[in-house]
């Protein structure tokens, strides 16, 4: 049977026409679509297993993969094998954007293994495919038979000269003062992530509303296509838990969990006591139903077997725990650690605690602790970025590490996880907005945040610690940046916004909203919503409460260090920049890099040369910098008659004289008659040997009429005569 091809397009304004097509490609997947903007095209497919999940599975195994094919832009992949390999950071971050927006929209209890693959099959290298991938993934699910709540769309919002733009291209983003990716349904926003140049909370809301208008239209387009495809939904019904199980569990644990919730405890102590309650309740429940339910009853009503399933009992206890904590916050405005809704945990800051780092800070907020260091380098240390829309070098980076011991666990140590990449990217974007321009501070900057303890908001601790480490290292950032994670508990029209959330509040709550910024505005944000129907007035309230929390944290940071240190750290490289003629670059580099390597080995300085003749010298010692600079200046020096040089004897001719290299790659002749002012020289080798270092004066420069080469006449006798007459010799130049 030939599939019906459906292709529909929508004009979002400003020349942004997006089309969605289904029925042509990847027809054996449960759902597939191709989304196009300009000449950028993404293919999204979704397949959900029909195999019944294991009875003890308690999570939704959703896998989202986003891949950019180099062939999409007519490029070859780098590397020896010339094919795509593991996903890049850009691909991982794009996959996370899609995953975070889609995951809450699958029905509760749907635990079938599901895989979404988004592939960029064409790239015009102008329109980024990441938000198109979110739209395509949702559309692929909508045309499938997989259970799904609502169509979801993603857009990017930029702003140029005060005017908002939907899905700005890479050229427009250069001039935009914000870059926000927004994911949402017709009724609500479910995901935010972006960076901004210190915009206000009101401007942020305006940008979200502008993006939501486009999202509604894209969702309507998906619904139109889904209605035409008209694929019947596969049967799915979540397991019905017997009421006698929920009643028994609630009766056994509700009071105990409430008492525990109202007792402020350390994370470790709370976890131990909670685990003990779980173990006791599970054991008591299983024993109760073993005695109460006969095998015949289970055979007659298989749902009664759930009463003996420890995993199901665990889920029911967790539901009671969640309800207890949420009502404690909503009814009594109390939190697990005894704080008020808006209270930020105690903050402590130590600076300069890593002696050899170029800047360091230990930032502790409650039971979350980040050890952050900075390293300053040269352009050689920049990270090479090669993707479909960006081939520039990256000179400002933040790497976030989350070892298992930070939460008191053992675990895998190896390649960086997706969560670590995502958290590091958010913190990097927050601080990048206040980094000094390259013209003023030409260093490559690497920030490393190692999370030593975690009980919520570790990415925001990385923002605060990263800012402090930069200031400790003398990096002239424009303004300090702080970050705070906000939470939400919502039941009907009743809600509470929480500042500086704990891990449990994140897990049991409805929102995780991270906001970073300066005193003057927001620089980065990330929001994930677990519920439908987030009203804009709640979002406005959360942003304002986050602003107050952000300022409180900035006060604490500025108490520790009011401004960046004036000097760089002792072991940080000092950069000196000079401009040389373009035709002199080869002279400095030397044959096969011989000369520049020699300078590096002798002085300890690292030297970078740009194509325009900009030479950057990096060295941690002043002496090394001066030595390298002097050597380069000597290399570039032009021979001047009357100048005295310290040269090296390269060749000796007994009856003629000695050839001396008085400048790099420049030899002159000291005639036998010019060797001594006090005696007659009969044999040159009696006075000079190859390798000797001698002072010579350039006395004449002329061109050989026969060969056209420039000849340099040098004199040792003139140096002796000048010294005897007391002539100044300030112009001495040494050939290194």
From Swiss-Prot:
- Pfam family for this entry, one: RNase_PH
Name the EC number(s).
2.7.7.8
- Keyword field: Cytoplasm, Magnesium, Metal-binding, Nucleotidyltransferase, RNA-binding, Transferase
Reactions catalysed, as given in the entry = RNA(n+1) + phosphate = RNA(n) + a ribonucleoside 5'-diphosphate
Subcellular location as annotated: Cytoplasm
Coarse class of the primary localization is cytoplasm
List of residues binding Mg(2+): 506, 512
Q: Name one GO cellular component term.
A: cytosol
- GO MF annotations, alphabetized: 3'-5'-RNA exonuclease activity; magnesium ion binding; polyribonucleotide nucleotidyltransferase activity; RNA binding
Q: Any idea where the KH domain is?
A: 573-632
Q: What class of enzyme is it?
A: transferase
Q: Where is the S1 motif domain?
A: 642-717
Q: Which cofactor does it need?
A: Mg(2+)
UniProt KW Metal-binding keyword: yes
Q: Which Gene Ontology terms describe the biological processes this protein takes part in?
A: mRNA catabolic process; RNA processing
Q: Does the keyword Transferase apply?
A: yes
- Please describe what this protein does: Involved in mRNA degradation. Catalyzes the phosphorolysis of single-stranded polyribonucleotides processively in the 3'- to 5'-direction.
Q: Which family does it belong to?
A: Belongs to the polyribonucleotide nucleotidyltransferase family.
Matching PANTHER family: POLYRIBONUCLEOTIDE NUCLEOTIDYLTRANSFERASE, POLYRIBONUCLEOTIDE NUCLEOTIDYLTRANSFERASE 1, MITOCHONDRIAL
Q: What is this protein called?
A: Polyribonucleotide nucleotidyltransferase
Species assigned in the record = Chlorobium limicola (strain DSM 245 / NBRC 103803 / 6330)
């Amino acid at each position: 049977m030939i599939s019906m091809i459906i292709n529909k397009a929508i004009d979002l304004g400003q020349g942004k026409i997006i089309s969605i097509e289904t029925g042509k490609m990847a027809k054996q997947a449960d759902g597939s679509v191709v989304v196009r903007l300009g000449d950028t095209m993404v293919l999204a497919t979704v397949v959900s297993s029909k195999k019944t999940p294991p009875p003890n599975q308690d999570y939704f195994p959703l896998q989202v993969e986003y891949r950019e094919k180099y062939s999409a832009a007519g490029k070859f992949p780098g590397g020896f094998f010339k094919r795509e390999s593991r996903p890049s950071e850009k691909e991982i971050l794009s996959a996370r954007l899609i995953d975070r927006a889609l995951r809450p929209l699958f029905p509760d209890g749907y635990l079938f293994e599901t895989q979404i693959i988004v592939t960029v099959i064409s790239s015009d290298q102008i329109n980024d495919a990441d938000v198109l991938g979110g739209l395509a993934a949702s559309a692929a699910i909508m045309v499938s038979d997989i259970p799904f709540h609502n169509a979801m769309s993603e857009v990017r919002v930029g702003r140029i000269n005060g005017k908002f733009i939907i899905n700005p291209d890479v050229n427009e983003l250069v001039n935009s003062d914000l870059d926000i990716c927004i994911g949402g349904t017709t009724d609500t926003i479910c995901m935010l992530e972006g960076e901004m140049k210190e915009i206000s909370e009101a401007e942020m809301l305006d940008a979200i509303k502008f993006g939501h208008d486009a999202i509604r239209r894209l969702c309507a387009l998906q619904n139109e296509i889904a209605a035409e495809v008209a694929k019947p939904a596969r049967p799915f019904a979540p397991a019905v838990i017997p009421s006698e199980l929920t009643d028994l569990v609630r009766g056994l644990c509700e009071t105990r969990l409430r008492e525990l919730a109202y007792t402020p405890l350390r994370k470790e102590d709370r976890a131990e006591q909670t685990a003990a309650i779980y173990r006791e309740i599970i054991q008591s429940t299983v024993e109760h139903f073993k005695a109460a339910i006969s095998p015949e009853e289970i055979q007659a009503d298989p749902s009664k077997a759930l009463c003996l399933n420890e995993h199901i009992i665990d889920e029911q206890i967790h539901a009671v725990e969640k309800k207890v904590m949420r009502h404690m916050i909503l009814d009594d405005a109390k939190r697990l650690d005894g704080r008020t809704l808006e209270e930020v945990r105690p903050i402590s800051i130590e600076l300069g605690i890593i002696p050899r780092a170029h800047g360091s800070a230990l930032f502790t907020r409650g039971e979350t602790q980040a050890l952050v260091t900075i390293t300053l380098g040269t352009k050689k240390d920049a990270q090479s970025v090669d993707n479909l829309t960006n081939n520039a070098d990256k000179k400002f980076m933040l790497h976030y590490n989350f070892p298992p011991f930070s939460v008191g666990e053992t675990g895998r140590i190896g390649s960086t996880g997706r969560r670590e990449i995502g958290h590091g990217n958010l913190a990097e974007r927050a601080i990048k907005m206040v980094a000094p321009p390259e013209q003023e501070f030409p260093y490559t900057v690497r920030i490393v945040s190692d999370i030593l303890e975690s009980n919520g908001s570790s990415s925001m601790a990385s923002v605060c610690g990263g800012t402090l480490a930069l200031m400790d290292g003398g990096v002239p950032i424009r303004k300090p940046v702080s970050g705070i994670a906000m939470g939400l508990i919502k039941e009907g029209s009743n809600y509470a916004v929480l500042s500086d959330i704990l891990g449990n509040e994140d897990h049991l709550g409805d929102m995780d909203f991270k906001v970073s910024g300066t005193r003057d505005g927001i620089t980065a944000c990330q929001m994930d919503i677990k519920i439908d129907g987030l009203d804009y007035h709640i979002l406005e309230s959360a942003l304002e409460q986050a602003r107050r929390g952000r300022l409180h944290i900035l006060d604490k940071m500025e108490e520790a260090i009011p401004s960046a240190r004036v000097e760089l750290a002792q072991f940080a490289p000092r950069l000196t920049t000079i401009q040389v003629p373009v035709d002199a670059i080869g002279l400095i580099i030397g044959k096969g890099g011989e000369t520049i390597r020699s300078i590096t080995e002798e002085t300890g300085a690292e030297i970078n040369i740009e194509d325009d003749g900009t030479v950057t010298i990096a060295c941690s010692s002043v002496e090394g910098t001066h030595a390298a600079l002097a050597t380069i200046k000597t290399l570039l020096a032009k021979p001047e008659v009357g100048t005295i040089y310290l040269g090296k004897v390269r060749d000796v001719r007994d009856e003629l004289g000695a050839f001396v290299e008085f400048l790099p790659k420049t030899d002159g002749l000291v005639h036998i008659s010019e060797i001594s002012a006090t005696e007659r020289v009969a044999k040159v080798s009696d006075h000079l040997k190859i390798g000797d270092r001698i002072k010579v004066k350039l006395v004449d420069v002329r061109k050989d009429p026969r060969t056209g080469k420039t000849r340099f006449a040098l004199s040792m006798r003139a140096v002796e005569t000048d010294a005897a007459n007391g002539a100044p010799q300030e112009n001495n130049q040494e050939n290194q």
